[in-house]
């Protein structure tokens, strides 16, 4: 489905509400290459929110016990302006439109945000939030990726110009995302307008460098900065080092309860999965990669914060002595009981 037909058929397809949830699975696959000595992959269930920022900022999306979008509302999951790019006093839609216009010259009419919602309005973590940007002809013309790394909790903003809906976007990696993968990689992303299904396919190609040639002192780019685009042909023969695929189906907000109950604390689970898979990679012999110069260095407070978050995530996910399914059933039962009070 093209982006223009998606807009035209919206009233019939999504009951005139563009904001909703998407539920499915995410696959991560690490390939053996220079600086990575193993193949390693995993798949986890996920759900994310797709938010029409005009609807959110106009107060058109109804709040519920399960998810809310207004300040001061109590809910299991919550959208918070402060979690995202720009000044908290400025609307997020305006911040993204200005960013894209300044970077590309494109005039943006509408912005959709794909993201994790915060747990209880207290904690949020997004490995990547994606802003889909549409022009006056209702075509997807740009995307903004707001990438967070761990454990440093830096952010990098990538502004990607999309010539055609089904084009692949290729650019150089310049942000230290993982302590078990260096920066000498290039990205290839396949982004299309979310419809009944949401599919994102991204791969990372290893640059043709010998291990001894890697510049470990190359600058680390964070925050808002231009990115370097490259042609797909220039890296087509480079080895694939990493593959990510997100495959989800749409869930209407009126049906949010079942979706959210499957994973009420999605940001905490994301932190848990990242740390568990990192431990597996480290255990299997992949070397730790120190952060590049100019990146924020970890301190004692950061280490304690991550230990606390990991501990909470582990307890919420697995319990202390209660099996995981019993723990989840008990937690979900409490939420349902609280809803009826």
What would you call each of these model-derived segments?
Residues 2-341:
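Mature, function-bearing regions of proteins
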